[in-house]
Design a protein with these regions (language model features):
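Gly/Ala-rich beta-loop-alpha elbow adjacent to hydrolase catalytic centers
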Residues: 91-96, 100
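Short beta-strand/loop motif that positions the catalytic acidic residue
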Residues: 201-203
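Flexible "cap/lid" loop of the alpha/beta hydrolase fold
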Residues: 108-109, 113-154, 158, 181-184, ...
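Active-site catalytic motif of lipid deacylating hydrolases and related acyltransferases
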Residues: 27-85
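Conserved loop-alpha-helix segment in the C-terminal half of the alpha/beta-hydrolase fold
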Residues: 205-231, 237, 242, 250
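N-terminal signal peptide c-region/cleavage motif recognized by signal peptidases
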Residues: 21-23
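Active-site glycine-rich loops that stabilize anionic/oxyanionic intermediates
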Residues: 38-41, 94-95, 118
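Active-site nucleophile elbow and catalytic-triad environment of alpha/beta-hydrolase enzymes
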Residues: 172-194, 205
Length: 257
C-alpha cells in the first residue's frame, strides 16, 4: 500500500511540475510592453492602461522621457528595452511615436503601437508631420519659457489636450506635465522601424493636437492595422480599455509567432 501511495505521490508531483513549468513558459513567452509617453506628459499619463495590461499577465515598463532631444529620449527607451526579456511590443503616444520609430529598430522589438502619434519617415522631423493639414487648435496653447522648453497652458490642457476629462484631472495633468525642448521637434530620425516591424495605429477622432487626418494618413503610409477611438489626444486617459485592447492585440499577434 505504501508503495502504491508513493507512486501516486510521485505522479502527482510530476504533473504539478509540468503544470508549473507550462505556466512559467507561457509567462516567459508573452511579449512585454514598453510604453513611451509624449510631450506635455510623463509616465503617469499611462496609469490607467498599465493595470489593464498587467491583469492579462503582461509585463509593462513605462519610459520616463527627459524630453530634451530625440537622441535623449531614444537613449532612455533603449535602456528600458535592454532590461526586457524576450520579445517587446513598443508603444508610443504623440511625440513618443517619433521616439519608437527610431528606437524600434532594436532587435528585441517585435511590434510597434502608435497611439495618436507621429510616425515619421527616416530623415523627417516631428514638426514636418502636420504639413498640408489644418492646424489643430491646441497648437496655439503651447507656450515657450525662457529656457527653450514648451508647455501646455492650463486652458489648452483642459480644452484641447484632454477635453474629454474632468477639470480636476486636467489640472493635475497641467501640474505634472513634462515640458519638451522646442528643438526636439526639429530632430530628424535616422531609421523607420515600422518598415520592418508590424505596426498598429490607434487614431483619436476628436484629437485637437495632432489632426485626425494626419493620423489617418500616417497609419496608411506605414501600413499599420488601424483602429479608431472617440477620444481627445489622450485616449489612454479617457478610453484606457480601448487602448489596452489594441496593445493586447499586438501582444497576441507577436506572441503567436
Amino acid at each position: 500500500m505504501k508503495t502504491i501511495k508513493s507512486k501516486f505521490a510521485t505522479v502527482a508531483f510530476a504533473l504539478a511540475g509540468t503544470f508549473i513549468a507550462s505556466a512559467s513558459h507561457a509567462q516567459d513567452t508573452t511579449p512585454s510592453v514598453v510604453i513611451v509617453h509624449g510631450a506635455f506628459a510623463d509616465g503617469s499619463d499611462w496609469a490607467k492602461v498599465v493595470p489593464l495590461l498587467q491583469a492579462k499577465g503582461v509585463a509593462v515598463t513605462v519610459v520616463q522621457n527627459p524630453l530634451t532631444s530625440l537622441a535623449d529620449d531614444v537613449a532612455a527607451t533603449r535602456r528600458a528595452l535592454s532590461n526586457q526579456q524576450g520579445k517587446v511590443v513598443l508603444v508610443g503616444h504623440s511625440w513618443g511615436g517619433t521616439v519608437i520609430t527610431e528606437a524600434g529598430s532594436d532587435q528585441k522589438v517585435s511590434a510597434l503601437v502608435y497611439v495618436a502619434a507621429f510616425a515619421p519617415e527616416a530623415g523627417q522631423t516631428s514638426g514636418e508631420q502636420g504639413k498640408g493639414a489644418p492646424t489643430p487648435p491646441g497648437i496655439s496653447q503651447i507656450k515657450a519659457d525662457g529656457n527653450g522648453f514648451l508647455s501646455m497652458t492650463p486652458e489648452g490642457m483642459a480644452k484641447d489636450f484632454a477635453q474629454d476629462l474632468p477639470a480636476a484631472q486636467t489640472a493635475v495633468m497641467t501640474a505634472t506635465q513634462g515640458p519638451i525642448k522646442a528643438s526636439a521637434f526639429e530632430d530628424k530620425t535616422t531609421v523607420s522601424a515600422w518598415k520592418t516591424k508590424p505596426s498598429w495605429y490607434l487614431l483619436a477622432t476628436d484629437d485637437r493636437m495632432i489632426h485626425p487626418d494626419v493620423q489617418r494618413s500616417a497609419a496608411k503610409r506605414i501600413g499599420a492595422t488601424l483602429a479608431e477611438v472617440h477620444s481627445s489626444h489622450v485616449p489612454q486617459q479617457s478610453q484606457p480599455a480601448e487602448v489596452a485592447a489594441v496593445i493586447l492585440k499586438a501582444v497576441a499577434s507577436v506572441g503567436a509567432k
